[in-house]
Amino acid sequence: ATAQEQPEGEAPDKVESPVVXXXEAXIVLVNYAREADVDAMMKDAVDYWGQIDVIANNAGITVIALNLTGVFLCSQAATKIMMKKRKGRIINIASVVGLIGNIGQANYAAAKAGVIGFSKTAAREGASRNINVNVVCPGFIASEMTAKLGEDMEKKILGTIPLGRYGQPEDVAGLVEFLALSPAASYITGQTFTIDGGIAI
């Protein structure tokens, strides 16, 4: 299931996934910061598919409400379901800013650092039920937002990245796919993975 934040009353025409090209997807409009909405979303997913194997929390914009509260509520609701079958994987998307900070982004850095701390605790709590919890911290990823940056700002940003370029959405998706689905990731939990071109070196 794909849950996306959209203006009220609107829904995307389609869901594009760089990870699983032929997978079935359902679109759900939900307020991640409202516990009742999250619980209803999880119930709908279980009713439709029968279980929840993996969740990847990747919501943002409203800094604390979505970046931290939303991650907590979605992880909590999914864990209750995963505990019954003693298996599951949770991948929370934070940011390299949550590790190293950034001028003018105190609230964002605090929220993302909170996601990292929460995930480590959730990993300890879920381990006895075979629930893996990990964090992915992207750096600057090519997006509509970076496309709007001026030439001077882009040059300044690229100067902070040892690899000298933006990451691509597929870079992040590939790491999330590995953590979510690969048998080789079954012994990985409580870890924070940077995918940032070397910013946090």
From Swiss-Prot:
Catalytic residues identified in the record: 108 (proton acceptor)
Enzyme class: oxidoreductase
Any single GO BP term: fatty acid biosynthetic process
Pathway where it operates: Lipid metabolism; fatty acid biosynthesis
Catalytic activity: a (3R)-hydroxyacyl-[ACP] + NADP(+) = a 3-oxoacyl-[ACP] + NADPH + H(+)
Top-level taxonomic group: Eukaryota
Tissue specificity of this protein: Embryo and leaf tissues.
SUPFAM superfamilies: NAD(P)-binding Rossmann-fold domains (SSF51735)
GO molecular function: 3-oxoacyl-[acyl-carrier-protein] reductase (NADPH) activity
Primary residence: plastid
Entry binding sites for substrate: 95
EC number from the UniProt entry: 1.1.1.100
Pfam short name (any one): adh_short_C2
Keywords: Chloroplast, Fatty acid biosynthesis, Fatty acid metabolism, Lipid biosynthesis, Lipid metabolism, NADP, Oxidoreductase, Plastid
Gene Ontology cellular-component terms listed: chloroplast
Subcellular location: Plastid, Chloroplast
Record-stated family: Belongs to the short-chain dehydrogenases/reductases (SDR) family.
Additional facts recorded: Exhibits a marked preference for acyl-carrier protein derivatives over CoA derivatives as substrates.
Subunit structure: Homotetramer.
Protein name: 3-oxoacyl-[acyl-carrier-protein] reductase
The organism of origin for this protein: Brassica napus (Rape)
Source organism phylogeny: Eukaryota, Viridiplantae, Streptophyta, Embryophyta, Tracheophyta
